[in-house]
A protein has these predicted regions:
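Short linear sequence elements within intrinsically disordered, low-complexity coil regions
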Residues: 48, 90, 136, 141-144, ...
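Short, well-structured alpha-helical patches and their helix-loop capping segments
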Residues: 2, 14, 146-150, 199
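Intrinsically disordered, low-complexity segments enriched in small/polar residues
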Residues: 15, 26, 62, 79, ...
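Non-catalytic, low-structured ubiquitin/UBL-interacting segments
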Residues: 1-77, 93-98, 205-213
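Alpha-helical coiled-coil scaffolding segments
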Residues: 152-213
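Papain-like cysteine protease catalytic cores
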Residues: 56-179
Length: 213
């Protein structure tokens, strides 16, 4: 493994640590301060949750004096180094057209998103170089490889590629709910964005809102 590739993998682990810390700050207090959030909510209108995907998670958050909840359906993706970009490609396609891309098209779209994200890294070098570990140019070159794991810098750059927020969730210990660890790009690009699930072991999957009722 090259030194540049090792830095990419190390950064993915670093991003996991940042995400875990953010999750404790972002989601914990809202749920703890509103015990009634555990009640069954009324869901907004969404496509019905299908039984063919692996799992359905609920996200509960405090809104004013009450609670709001959304069900998210998991769309598994291959763990081939492209999982971040595959997840964003899958979630974007489902949100736009209600259907997932074919495997070959999804792979091509994931690679396209990867290269556009790296283009954004280079374009925004002055903004992001400080949190890229090691040599910036070597990092960008390594990140273009299909097997390189994407992490927090790439998620942020994908918000500029899509001109849309990307919200990252992690499963809660109860294995039935998820907690948001960050809505990247939400300040710059308001509105509903793309949701992805981070498992804490370097793997991402696509999430889409659905209706369990």
């Amino acid at each position: 493994m090259s030194a540049a590739a090792a830095r990419v993998i190390a950064h993915a682990a670093c991003a996991w640590g940042l995400a875990s810390a953010a999750s404790a700050r972002a989601a914990g207090p809202a749920v703890r301060s509103h015990p009634q959030c555990a009640a069954v909510p009324t869901f907004v209108s969404r496509p019905r949750c299908a039984s063919l995907t692996r799992a359905v998670y609920r996200h509960v958050e405090a809104v004013g004096d009450g609670c709001d909840a959304t069900s998210y359906e998991v769309y598994p993706v291959a763990g081939d180094g492209r999982c971040l970009f595959r997840s964003v490609a899958a979630a974007t396609a489902i949100r736009a057209d209600g259907a997932r891309l074919s495997p070959d098209v999804e792979t091509a779209e994931a690679d396209r998103l990867r290269n556009l994200a790296v283009d954004q890294l280079r374009r925004r070098r002055a903004e992001v170089e400080w949190f890229i570990e090691g040599d910036f140019d070597a990092y960008c070159d390594a990140m273009r490889r299909p097997i390189a794991w994407g992490g927090e810098p790439e998620i942020l750059m994908l918000t500029h590629v899509l001109e849309s927020p990307v919200e990252v969730f992690m499963p809660s210990p109860d294995a039935r709910t998820v907690r948001s660890i960050g809505a990247y790009g939400a300040d710059e690009y308001p509105g509903e964005g793309v949701a992805i699930l981070f498992h804490g072991a370097g793997h991402y999957e696509a999430l889409t809102p659905c209706d369990e009722s």
